[in-house]
Amino acid sequence: MKKTITLSLLALAAIANAQQKSISGFSDANAAKELQTEQTFDAALSAKRIGENLKELSAYPHNIGSPGSKAVAEKILQQYKSYGLDAHIETYTVLFPTPKTRVLELTGPTKYTALLKEPALAEDATSGQTNQLPTYNAWSADGDVTGQLVFVNYGLPDDYETLAKLGIDVKGKIVIAKYGRSWRGIKPKVAYEHGAIGCIIYSDPADDGYSAGEVYPKGAYKNEYGVQRGSVMDMVIYPGDPLTPGVGATKDAKRLDRKDATTILKIPVLPISYHDAKPLLEALDGTVAPRHWQGGLPITYHIGAGKAIVHLNMQFNWDMVPAYDVIAKIKGSTWPDEWVMRGNHHDAWVNGAGDPLSGQVAMLDEAKALGDLLKTGWKPKRTIVYCSWDGEEPGLLGSTEFAEEHDKELQEKAVVYINSDGNGRGFYGGGGSQALEHFMDEITGSVIDPQTNVSVGERKKAHELVTAATTKEKKEILGKKGLALEALGSGSDFSSFLQHLGVPTLDLAFGGEDGGGEYHSIYDSFDDYRRFKDPTFAYGVALSQTAGHAVLRMADAELLPFDFRSLQTTIAKYATEVSELADKMRENTALENQQMTMFLLLTRPNTNKHL
């Protein structure tokens, strides 16, 4: 009954949205014309073409600096040109480390040498290819260290507070942390701040392995050998090429010495599989880890430090490599010096069907549909710039260097930057500048969800309502007319535009029904994607529609559709949340002080007691 009522409400909302005539930034007469343009645009999109393009671009490894990366960039360039866009490649020269030595050994009390290898699978056609990057964390320090092993849960500040209460110090030791609950680079940074000499990060099966579902290739989740590669660059300091902070990494740019680059970590770091983690964790003795630290392996998790001794040796090639940014433009007819920018990266750790190519091919199909519109005589009022970035995975290299080289021009001309990355099956997800919330509400009301035949906006709101944890959250969702845009931190190519240049930004994707464990592994492949992520590529089309409508409306609006009332409301909400958090922290501190006082009273020796 509840499901029927929910679907009925969604159907009514979809009908209301279908009857929408007014569009922010457009007069009524031009709104009707814009809606017709969007219908023509939508008709030009093709799930079949998106799937074919995904298969072609993910056919081989294409990390930055590799022959595959150049080949992918050149294919994208030719596609843009074939669509009628004015396209070229901008090349930057950036630092990129690759491992030449990776050794992880348990030397006592038992001996074990980590495999550090993901095996090829018959069910995954590209998993056995050569030229795959090995499993590693970029921007780890060179280092050859041996020390006691300590389990630190997820390796976050709260976990080290727990260790301190237990009287356990990691200084001079090697820590092992679970992936998850934060960006991976936080884990070795916090470990170093607490005196650790090395950091191992592993994927626990409780998070994305057999505890979550069937493992690959039978199911979508991480098998025992899967490893998440990834950057651990300290991007809080600055993103992009570590040697050229603040300036574009052109061939002749002035560069720092590597020892002076503050975003490169100070200790060796290595990611491993749960197959390799199990012998290490089994060897730990000492204090039994708290219940909420226990994981999915069939062992009792201990913290150490004790008899378990680990040897970790990481040595890198620190090479200068080319980054190929593919830039394509459609010149505006009325305001050519106002730019609507759209971006997605093309580099991957290995084949990268999900991350990033599922977003890249959706963006390319948008460009194809815009090219078809150009053939009908349509021209955008503002200049549209499509950007296929290189080097996102190691640290937002391509987008950051482009933004640094063109910073003054972008600050003068860019009116919005619309980003995407990986894409999958499920619910609309949007983050960005809150002044664009109403703008995105109108767009998500105009795009129909492939599975439910209601708007993607209404399906998202229904999902939020069903999954809300408290009555307060449910009331807030029901009381808000549209959808909130999530605050953007970092982690994708919007970072330099939003946080360094102050350009209004959107970050768009679909997902939530495409869980799995392939992320940054050799199994992020076309075979995995077509089985478990978006088998019909219908959500690739949904992303093309959502981002494409945003591009079209921004490019053709008579007035740019910013609504700063949403920004004011969001800032006020954040201020309230900070105040409430401060009050809660004061209460918790007072309670902990009382508990400590009671503990001291109970444990203080009674000097008056007669024996």
PLM feature spans:
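Structural recognition of the beta-strand scaffold that forms the well-ordered cores
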Residues: N53-E56, H88-I89, L149-V152, I174-K178, ...
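Hydrophobic h-region of N-terminal signal peptides that target proteins for export
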Residues: L10-N17
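Alpha-helical metal-binding/catalytic segments enriched in His/Glu/Asp
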Residues: P205, V326, R342-L396, A547
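Noncatalytic luminal/extracellular "stalk/propeptide" segments of secretory-pathway proteins
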Residues: Q20-A32, K55-D169, I174, P205, ...
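A conserved hydrophobic secondary-structure block that centers on an alpha-helix together
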Residues: V152-Y221, S333, D337-W339, W349, ...
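N-terminal capping segment at the start of a domain
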Residues: D28-P67, G286-V288, D421
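Metal-dependent peptidase/peptidase-like ectodomains
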Residues: E224-V288, W335, D390-R530, D556, ...
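Soluble metallo-hydrolase cores and metallopeptidase-like ectodomains found primarily
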Residues: S127-T162, I237-G354, K368, D372-T376
